[in-house]
Amino acid sequence: MNNFSETQIQDIKFLDELLDQVIILDKSKNICCANKSAHKRFGSQLEGKSISSVLRDAKLLDSIETSINQKKTQIVDVEVKKPNFQFYKASIIPGPSKLCNQEQSVIIFLKDLTEVFKTQKFKSDFVANVSHELRTPLQSIKLGLETINQGHATNDFESQKKFLPILLQQTSRMETLVSDLLSLSKIELEEHIRPTDKLDLKEIILHVVEIHKQIIKKNDISVDIKGEESKYIILGHRDRLIEVFTNLIDNAIKYSPKGKKIYISLVNNNESTTVSIRDEGIGIPKKYISRITERFFRVDPAKSKEVGGTGLGLAIVKHIVNQHRAEIDIKSEEGKGTEFILTFPNS
């Protein structure tokens, strides 16, 4: 700050208190001053650098020129792609100013709206996905009803009977989707509330396995449960933990060929309890593992719809795990199977 007067230093100190990033350019569009927030975001050595080397955004650079030429404040959206996506609302104010008295200088105020942008995009994508997921069964139901009402099946009871299972299947698919959406919405609203009930994880898992007894037998799958202790006590929400293990065991069954095994193990590590659910199924390609807990993400959409998946099950699992302050790790290899490892803090 050796080149600034006492008044200018006080102005800089004031700007340092702002959460927004403030960058001041001289007439050559080089940075002559930046506040602490800007240094923290874009680097400690900003002074002397060209603005184009710090923020590579064509709209911003064009707006700086416009602000200088028209001597008017310009407001523009700025997107930074690397190293991480950032979204700013930039206000570009033409100089001169107290901190740079050159005629063609400008002050840039950057308001970080990255999280707002992500939330809006998330909502937009979510609505689009829900619309798409509902449209397919609705079209099937509409087509079936039109055929019964106006087509060749109008007076043909046998033909009508053929359409009824299809209508019931698609109605059930919609019902499951809506149920999962409501469940996910409720979990997200309450995710910050940590459960306080003392529960035995092993008892919950045995309960879920018992519920799946018939489908396990039908698919000729065996379940191997190992646990060194009789009880594994954590603080949890019983119904939601049942939902977690229902989703994971259900997936293990659906994506495993007949005659295979599902391995479930529980280990108490003093401060935490680890549950592993491993199958010998089709596995997940490595490039998709990090995405499978995203809403509506499917590795194989055709297979998922064939087995009745909504694409929301693992998203529900992730949010319930978060609510329990637990961690989830996923390991998988194509053709060999998938393992979900959940680590819960002990009560």
Question: Positions of the model-derived regions?
Answer:
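Sensory modules in modular signal-transduction proteins
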Residues: N2-A38
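PAS-family sensory/regulatory modules and their coupling/dimerization elements
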Residues: S50-E115
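Short alpha-helical segment of the dimerization/phosphotransfer core of two-component systems
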Residues: Q169-M174
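Conserved micro-motifs of the catalytic ATP-binding
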Residues: L189-R194, I233-G236
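Short conserved segments within the C-terminal catalytic ATPase subdomain
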Residues: I215-I225
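Short conserved segment of the HATPase_c
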Residues: I284-F296
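Conserved glycine-rich
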Residues: R325-A326
